[in-house]
């Protein structure tokens, strides 16, 4: 079986509500979608972060896949090992799009689910985290935000069955602390997290962390910039620290462990360059006694299915993962169903999802008119 063609599409899909963080507010997601075709008729689908800049890299890398077997992924990764050096996150994202498409094709060719190809299931359902941002209380005065967001979060967790909640933090450290206190008061039993995306200084991270110790947070994610800063915070705060910003490649792992900077590392198939690297990260975390979770970059159904397969086959990934999937107003696959705050791991061949090509074309046309929504 040889790859004969690679199709690349860039799509814009709306969110149900605006989503805000310490560095952006967005109303939709732009994603790059890939299809590989083979001489046997088997096809594989992939999806990755961002839009046209990543799609341009994907098209360059795709030239190296033509004539190769989808099973020859190790050779493909070795050939592209310098791509992240030149393109950073964009390079990892581009490699991952093709990587996932090849895994999907391998599963379809063998009649096996991606979970089975990765070692078999260790869980059949994956719990998601309810993501809370200040945009969930539009027009509310700052003084009233804690109460408004607590009411919103209580409603979301009750209706959706979520057992974990993450607040997207901002540069308003005191305001974030006040919101978290109110969230804990109405949700005493959920796993509670906060992620300022490194918007806080080291001193502010220490002060906020000490103030938050009484709330029994599951972890504090990327309060400040860098491994050195995180290590200073961890030395003074009795809350586990998590990162998806200072350990973003394997070269970062050793210094983070040596300096005692983190307790939990967020992996991501699309930020780490594919499925095998994400599984390798899990092995690193288990070896050094660290926790692991999965980051969300706005995955649609194809990318979500890949994350579910990784979680479904990886014992260390036992926490409720971050996922924006339930926040999208539509999808380009037959939708995955959220039940009791969880998604079931697909069991069909490959990714186990079916792409709606009419919707794919529609949302590609939206991108052609509007340009990229997320960069």
Report residues per predicted region:
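Metal-dependent enolase-superfamily TIM-barrel catalytic cores that perform enediolate-based chemistry
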Residues: 119-236
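Shared catalytic-loop signature of beta/alpha-barrel
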Residues: 56, 210, 216, 225-242, ...
